[in-house]
Amino acid sequence: MRFFNKYKLFLDCAYKHLNIVLLDFKTNTVVDQLTIPVQQNLTELAVYHLEKLLKKNKVRNNTVRQFYVTTGPGSFTGQRVGAIIAKTWCTVNPNCQLFALNSLRLQIPYGCGISKISAGNEKNYCGLFTETTSEIALLAKPDFVKLCKANTELPVYENFENIDSIEELFLNNIERFELVENPQNLELLYLKDPVN
């Protein structure tokens, strides 16, 4: 009988980049990763690059045992694309567990901090994360400034700009992802209505 390696797969397309990270299941060693900016055709690009990365590394779909996805806030299209791929993957491959984490929490590499993702129209998705607090809100710029002034001891992370790598963020937060028992019950984090 032939045995295949097992893997963990991370997909994030909730903001301005398509991020894919493939990990060895046992060691959490990065096998491969991809980060590319996307503006158009996200659905086609996500599926194409995911298939390409798996083929390049000779990974069979049924050897991915854990699928990690971000739930937003961020791009409405990006959130939905990530969710659809994750739900479909775990439904078709029932031995694969689904884990989810919001994008604001993912942006903070270590423990505590203030996370901000631009929401357009002078507003920001903001998260305050301490040992005892986990608050998420849509804030206008003056309110974000107040939040930062009230928490000067916390580092601020903005728009995934001051990070070393997405794989580092993923690895540092892997224990914060929550198991989604039924993939069809995956919920996305929307803080504002879609733009018409």
Swiss-Prot record:
<dbReference type="InterPro" id="IPR043129">
    <property type="entry name" value="ATPase_NBD"/>
</dbReference>
<dbReference type="Pfam" id="PF00814">
    <property type="entry name" value="TsaD"/>
</dbReference>
<dbReference type="GO" id="GO:0002949">
    <property type="term" value="P:tRNA threonylcarbamoyladenosine modification"/>
</dbReference>
<dbReference type="InterPro" id="IPR000905">
    <property type="entry name" value="Gcp-like_dom"/>
</dbReference>
<protein>
    <recommendedName>
        <fullName>Uncharacterized protein MG208 homolog</fullName>
    </recommendedName>
</protein>
<dbReference type="InterPro" id="IPR022496">
    <property type="entry name" value="T6A_TsaB"/>
</dbReference>
